[in-house]
A protein has these predicted regions:
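Conserved donor-binding/catalytic core segment of Leloir-type glycosyltransferases
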Residues: 188-204, 210-213, 226-228
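Conserved acidic donor-binding segment of nucleotide-sugar-dependent glycosyltransferases
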Residues: 321, 325-332, 341-346
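A short, well-ordered alpha-helix in the C-terminal region of glycosyltransferases
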Residues: 341, 348-362
Length: 758
């Protein structure tokens, strides 16, 4: 898709919530689909207030004037490059009764258009009902940000359900490492912070929060209520600062000068997000029961704020006692009760904070951009999936998970959990990722230091008999888990990592290659005794890579012996309809056919290649669907008699995507068939939202990766396995890009910010 979209909306520097929303949405679309969408803006102006608009604003419109609206319709029709028009609708933005002037524009438009209703009145009079219904009838699609609004459009306005799309208000995933340090920057050290944000007007109900603070401050003298934001420009033009002055007097009357503070400025996004990040309780006290959505409300939840809110539409859909409280309109007693409860219970606030984040991660702007692209494509009737751009291959979260000893196993959200200890599995994969990085980009001290740590950890795990232990605790001691678990797969992964490092000898220090060589050579005493299919496969991979370093008849014989064993396993398990090595598909499936293909490349035995191709084709038939990959669920393996394709939703882990991509790359290297490259593109897009939830699994803020997809949500933790497997998959896409297009000339430590997946 390479289309031009025109948004008709208020837009910065105009100061209003819809302008901010539109800017955030446009930025998200640009970031996610740069080069695939051309976006232009028709900015709604305020009469008598000329604004200095810059790109992407191409047009301006006085929407309060009927003739201007009609003229704009003709201007849009005359521009053949505009493919689709997107209108942000709110009562008051457009002139005439209930914005009737907009209907004049839309009725003349010969382009398909989408309209987003920011407010849907539940009990409209006949004039409102007619105008909104006509706008909806003319639109190709109608979007709303709450399910309640969608339901009202169907039942009251009689819009067809297939025309209505519910896309939630976007949110920012914002993290600060030191909350107290940011409080200090704002002069709030030692304070318990309650806050609210928005352009001030009487319908914000700020008096409710101020009155509640009288009781709150009695029990918590260090509590401060921040009222963030300037007075709404329209209010200032009409009456100056009379409303703010009344609030100041109310504060004085209640003796709250030390407990209520104004931040009277139009905050930048970064400043706003920092204020929200240090907020202990967010207060939303609007007195408008018909308000459908609030950007600041969802921004606060996304920042991890427990929320106390009046019962407007969005709050009733999103808030429950796991993340906040609903109160009646104008009820300062209820607000004070809940605030006192929360301020007095750190554990409750922490629990609500976590749940608020979980509830809003589906609506981060990257996911909202994906939903919009899917909508645009449905209107344009395009079958070819437009993939998001490749994110940067940064090592920030891998580094965050790594201390002086090695990579820690788990994280709580993005915070490493030292108590989880370390595993050989994770450090072996991390070593492979660092070696891949040095191949794709110039090696530097930062990357090599990480690689050294992971290699040293593998050496630490190697025992006197040259085998490896897997589990290490926070005190760097081997745990009892090593005695109760089958460690063959872990040992196989270590062989894979050591062999891969050796294969990259041209990019790595000789001392590292020699160190890996010694560890691997010592392991020759036991490798041939492996019996687990995946352990055999990992070992074959490592030995294949060893042969890229030096030729060795001993190693070729080892590969042949292991591949012959895997061949026998396959011959026993497979039949005419089940061409696999076991009676079910479980985990790390793709490594089995990949190992057989590598065995063919090492030995030349055609039978190995035949089994590799036959079994991988079978696996792909179960996991690849129409333009997306369905990961085998770890909650319920896919068994022989389970049907044509795996259908279980949830339990999908990032590791399966990475291992499949390794196999696709190997098969492309072996055969040159471009179909494997196309499947690589589709597989990688799972991380970027091309999955059953239509949500990103890669975290664009931390550069880590979430731990997987559940039935209806994304696991928010970002542990070692997920992050490293994503990183390996992302680095494989560097090779994909060079094979699909002209080789990149980039030699920086960090790759170009965007590469196209199309």
């Amino acid at each position: 898709m390479n289309k031009t979209l025109l948004f008709i909306t208020s837009f910065p520097p105009r100061q209003c919530g819809i302008a901010t929303f539109a800017q955030d949405l446009v930025n998200a679309l640009h970031k996610t689909f740069a080069g695939k969408l051309n976006i232009e803006i028709c900015a709604l102006t305020e009469p008598g207030k000329p604004a200095a608009y810059e790109a992407p604003v191409q047009y301006t419109l006085n929407a309060l004037d009927a003739e201007s609206c009609i003229a704009m319709a003709h201007t849009i029709n005359a521009n053949a490059e505009i493919d689709l028009v997107c209108i942000e609708h709110e009562f008051g933005l457009y002139g005439g009764d209930y914005g009737h002037h907009l209907l004049g524009l839309l009725s003349l438009l010969d382009k398909p258009f989408i309209v987003r209703f920011h407010t849907v009145l539940p009990n409209p009079d006949q004039k409102c009902l007619k105008i909104v219904s006509l706008i909806g009838a003319l639109a190709a699609k109608v979007t709303v940000m709450t399910q309640t609004s969608a339901d009202i459009l169907q039942t009251t306005y009689q819009l067809a359900p297939e025309k209505i799309i519910h896309i939630p208000h976007g949110t920012h995933a914002h993290i600060i490492s030191d909350k107290e340090e940011v409080k200090k920057r704002f002069g709030l050290q030692g304070k318990m912070v309650l806050s609210t944000f928005g352009l001030l007007s009487e319908n914000k109900g700020l008096e409710t929060g101020i009155r509640a603070m009288k009781r709150v401050a009695t029990q918590f003298p260090n509590a401060v209520y921040l009222i963030l934001g300037r007075t709404h420009p329209t209010i200032v033009a009409r009456e100056g600062e009379r409303y703010r002055d009344r609030l100041v007097q109310l504060i004085k009357d209640n003796g709250l000068e030390k407990n209520v503070q104004f931040v009277n400025s139009y905050l930048s996004l970064d400043n706003l997000l920092d204020y929200l990040a240090i907020t202990d309780i967010y207060l939303f006290t609007s007195i408008d029961p018909h308000q459908a959505v609030s950007g600041t409300f969802v921004y606060a939840m996304s920042a991890g704020c427990p929320v106390i809110a009046t019962s407007f539409v969005q709050a009733k859909e999103m808030l429950d006692e796991s993340c906040g409280y609903l109160i009646d309109f104008n009820n300062d007693e209820q607000l004070a009760d809940h605030a006192i409860t929360l301020l007095g219970n750190d554990a409750l606030r922490a629990s609500m904070s976590k749940r608020a984040i979980e509830k809003t991660r589906n609506s981060i702007w990257e996911n909202v951009a994906l939903a919009h692209m899917a909508m645009f494509q449905s209107i344009e009737s395009e079958d070819q999936l437009v993939m998001p751009n490749l994110p940067p291959a940064y090592l920030d979260h891998a580094d965050r998970l790594t201390d002086e000893f090695g990579m820690m196993q788990f994280a709580k959200f993005d915070v490493p959990d030292p108590a989880s200890g370390y595993t050989l599995d994770d450090n072996a994969r991390a070593l492979i990722a660092m070696c891949m990085y040095t191949k794709d980009f110039e090696p530097n001290r930062y990357v090599l230091d990480l690689a050294h740590k992971y290699l040293d950890f593998i050496g630490f795990c190697q025992q006197k008999d040259a085998r490896f232990l897997n589990y290490v605790d926070v005190n760097h001691q081997f745990t009892d888990d090593n005695n109760g678990c089958n460690l063959e797969d872990s040992n196989g992964r270590a062989i894979w990592a050591l062999g891969y490092l050796m294969s990259q000898y041209q990019h790595l220090p000789t001392s590292m290659v020699k160190q890996a060589y010694l560890y691997l050579r010592d392991s020759f005493t036991w490798i041939e005794n492996l019996t687990s299919p995946r352990a055999i496969a990992f070992a074959i991979k490592g030995l294949y890579y060893y042969l890229q370093y030096e030729t060795s008849r001993t190693v070729v014989n080892l590969v042949n012996k292991l591949a012959n064993r895997l061949q026998k396993i396959y011959m026993v398990a497979h039949d005419e309809t089940w061409k696999w090595y076991e009676p079910c598909l479980t985990y790390a499936n793709a490594v089995l056919p990949e190992a057989m293909m590598m065995a063919w490349m090492a030995t030349g035995k055609a039978a190995y290649k035949h089994i590799a191709e036959q079994s991988f084709e079978f696996l792909c038939s179960k996991t690849f669907r129409n333009q997306y990959m369905k990961v085998i669920s770890n909650r319920n393996w896919y068994h022989k008699n389970d049907g044509e394709q795996c259908n279980d939703e949830g339990g999908e882990q990032p590791i399966e995507i990475a291992y499949t991509m390794f196999t696709l790359q190997t098969f492309y290297d072996a055969t040159g068939h471009s179909a494997y490259l196309e499947k690589m593109r589709v597989a990688f897009s799972w991380y970027l939202g091309n999955n059953h939830l239509k949500q990103v699994v890669y975290n664009p803020l931390t550069y880590g990766c979430y731990d997987g997809l559940e039935t209806s949500s994304v696991n928010q933790n970002q542990g070692a396995e997920s992050t490293v497997c994503y990183l390996m998959a992302r680095l494989l896409m560097e090779q994909w890009n060079k094979q699909k297009y002209v080789a990149s000339q980039n030699t920086n430590a960090r790759p170009p910010l965007y590469l196209s997946l199309n």
